[in-house]
């Protein structure tokens, strides 16, 4: 059936049929009665509406198919909704416009800010995180560094058991030295594991088989000073040179040692504290001259009266203060001579991050502070010539 013929044919034989144009544009007064329709195949109003709709949807090329469908009254599957099932969009060419569903709402979460177990922290856009322009991983998140994550978990486990008062006295320091096998005699061999990269040593193994010596030759302490002096000076906030004398009174294990520190020249008391060791964790660095030990302790001011055996030592120390930690180069003299390099985390920042429960990234900041501390130790350790 030709729709154009239905609209434009002036032949009186078909003029009584209501045109498609009048159906679309006239007020909804209902479809013509059956008496006005010469087509005996369309036996009802709904049949005519369905027939006209089928013709509009299929076009001129489908006339025969539509006629057969109208005769057989078979259900029709539409490739797109018919006009009576779509929202009106206007007339003319706009009436045939495709009706597409609104685009899906994009996920507005920034994947770089997700705190996934496989990610370490928030990162800038992936296109700026690598010099190749490639994303840092298939997720766009840089995986955490395993040694630092292990140290962070270790620290979190201990800090979580402390009271708010104890947290205010926490000290975390890292020293370079050698992890040694516990053997008889003065000459103890450095730990030799079948690995080629640094790793945290199992705590049970350390307690049963190992000890740690933080003593360095004095020549290496001077070399470490040159390394620190040659580093970028803009990161050094200040330096300090002190000479102190410590009086150490060994107390019970649950109380720790009492230490009175005096100025070596004037004798003025600088500090009176009770220091108690909490835990240690050791990192074996097989390709570097020395290993690393991190020690967690509490140092609280006290007015206790000194008791017990006293030992003294003289400390000649040069300190470099950085944002987040301080580096100490110390020559110790007493019953024996020794030299030590240690870096101590900024306790105010460390505990401030840890206790800030309102910050969803507080442990990310703790981990980053530990990363900075360990990277600074690595920087010096890898430049020493043992």
Curated annotation (Swiss-Prot):
Q: What does the UniProt keyword field contain?
A: Hydrolase, mRNA capping, mRNA processing, Nucleus
What cofactor does this chain's UniProt record say it requires?
Mg(2+)
Please tell me which top-level EC class this enzyme sits in. Answer: hydrolase
Question: Entry's InterPro entries?
Answer: Cet1/Ctl1, CYTH-like_dom_sf, mRNA_triPase_Cet1, mRNA_triPase_Cet1_sf
Q: Which GO terms describe its molecular function?
A: mRNA 5'-triphosphate monophosphatase activity; polynucleotide 5'-phosphatase activity
Annotated region described as Disordered, given as residue ranges: 1-137
UniProt-listed Pfam families = mRNA_triPase
Q: Which GO terms describe its biological process?
A: 7-methylguanosine mRNA capping
List membrane-spanning regions.
Answer: none
Q: Which family does it belong to?
A: Belongs to the fungal TPase family.
Q: What is this protein called?
A: mRNA-capping enzyme subunit beta
Subunit and partners: Heterodimer. The mRNA-capping enzyme is composed of two separate chains alpha and beta, respectively a mRNA guanylyltransferase and an mRNA 5'-triphosphate monophosphatase.
One GO cellular component term, please give it.
mRNA capping enzyme complex
Indicate where this protein resides in the cell: Nucleus
Q: What is its EC number?
A: 3.6.1.74
Q: Where is the composition biased (Acidic residues)?
A: 57-67
């Amino acid at each position: 059936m030709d729709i154009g013929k239905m609209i434009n044919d002036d032949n009186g034989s078909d003029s009584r049929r209501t045109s498609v144009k009048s159906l679309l544009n006239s007020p909804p007064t209902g479809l013509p009665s059956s008496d006005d329709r010469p087509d005996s195949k369309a036996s009802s109003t709904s049949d005519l509406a369905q027939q006209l709709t089928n013709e509009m949807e299929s076009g001129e090329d489908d006339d025969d198919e539509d006629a057969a469908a109208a005769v057989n009254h078979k259900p029709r599957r539409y490739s797109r909704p018919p006009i009576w099932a779509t929202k009106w969009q206007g007339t003319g060419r706009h009436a045939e416009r495709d009706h597409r569903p609104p685009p899906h709402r994009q996920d507005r979460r920034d994947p770089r800010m997700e705190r996934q177990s496989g990610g370490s922290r928030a990162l800038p856009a992936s296109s700026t995180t690598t010099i190749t322009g490639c994303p840092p991983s298939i997720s766009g998140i840089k995986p955490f560094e395993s040694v630092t994550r292990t140290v962070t978990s270790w620290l979190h486990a201990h800090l979580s058991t402390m009271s708010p008062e104890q947290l205010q006295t926490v000290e975390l320091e890292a020293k370079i030295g050698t992890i040694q096998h516990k053997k008889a005699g003065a000459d103890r061999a450095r730990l030799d594991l079948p690995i080629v990269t640094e790793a945290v040593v199992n705590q049970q193994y350390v307690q049963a088989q190992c000890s740690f010596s933080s003593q360095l030759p004095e020549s290496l302490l001077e070399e470490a000073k040159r390394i620190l002096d040659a580093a970028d000076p803009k990161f050094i906030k200040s330096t300090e040179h002190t000479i102190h004398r410590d009086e150490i009174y060994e107390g019970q294990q649950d109380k720790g040692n009492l230490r009175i520190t005096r100025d070596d020249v004037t004798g003025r008391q600088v500090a009176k504290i009770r220091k108690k060791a909490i835990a240690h964790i050791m990192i074996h660095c097989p390709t570097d001259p020395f290993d690393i030990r991190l020690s967690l302790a509490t140092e609280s001011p006290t007015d206790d009266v000194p008791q017990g055996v006293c030992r003294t030592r003289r400390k000649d120390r040069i300190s470099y203060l950085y944002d987040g930690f301080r580096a100490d180069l110390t020559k110790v003299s007493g019953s024996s001579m020794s030299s030590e390099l240690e870096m101590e985390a900024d306790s105010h920042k460390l505990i401030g991050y840890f206790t800030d429960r309102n910050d969803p990234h507080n442990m990310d900041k703790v981990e980053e502070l530990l990363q900075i501390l360990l990277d600074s130790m690595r920087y010096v350790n890898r430049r020493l010539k043992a």
